[in-house]
Design a protein with these regions (language model features):
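Terminal helix/beta-alpha structural elements that buttress the NAD(P)+-binding lobe
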Residues: 1-206
Length: 206
């Protein structure tokens, strides 16, 4: 049994599945906080690393809803999905800075790092100001360069959950579910997660 205060809960809209609802709390609120941390507005160009992962796949959609031009860093297998959601897909690897410059027209306004491993440095190299860079994973780089780490700031905000659930319910936001595992297969789920090649969220069910 789990006991939760009533004001920490929201109703599940009819068009939101239990799997989507389960994935929404952490990934959805983290993506929401990261997108709003970099102060996106219509016409801005934002780069998002890990753009097809659990958090990134939601962040790219929220950025598009705000009217931003979104460049998503992802493996080639996820480029079609990103393009279907209006995102300019860019491959990882050597030459990524030049590919981003080509896709952006030479200038970016903001960078959301949902992957880690040097992307804060890349964001600075591309000219994003520290106060418009947010990382949800590379806290050492954030401390070194003074960039934001606001990925969890919306977690306890039920109004954010209500807003996200409404976007799903009205078809404006998709929560990609990579795979659903039963709790007995939790080891397999974590091994899948560790490979970092999933599109969207991995969900555990009883």
């Amino acid at each position: 049994m789990v006991v939760v205060e009533a004001d920490h809960l929201i109703g599940r809209p009819p068009h939101v599945s239990w799997e989507q609802a389960g994935a929404l709390f952490v990934a959805g609120t983290t993506a929401y906080a990261a997108v709003h941390a970099v102060s996106l507005k219509a016409g801005d160009t934002v780069v998002i690393s890990g753009a097809a992962d659990g958090v990134g796949s939601i962040a790219v959609q929220l950025a598009k809803i705000l009217g931003a031009k979104v460049i998503g860093l992802a493996s080639a297998a996820n480029h079609t999905w990103l393009a279907e959601h209006g995102v300019i897909a860019v491959a990882y690897g050597e030459g990524v800075a030049d590919r981003i410059r080509a896709a952006s027209g030479g200038k970016i306004d903001a960078f959301i790092d949902a992957f880690g491993g040097g992307y804060v440095d890349l964001a600075l190299e591309l000219g994003a100001a520290p106060d418009r860079i947010d990382t949800i994973i590379d806290f050492a780089a954030a401390a070194k360069h003074g960039v934001k780490t606001e990925g969890n700031s919306a977690a306890a905000n039920t109004q954010v959950l209500v807003e996200l659930a409404s976007l799903i319910d009205t078809g404006r936001l998709e929560i990609p579910i990579a795979k659903v595992y039963h709790l007995a297969d939790v080891r397999d789920a974590y091994q899948d997660l560790a490979r970092r090649h999933t599109r969207g969220k991995i969900v555990l069910v009883p």
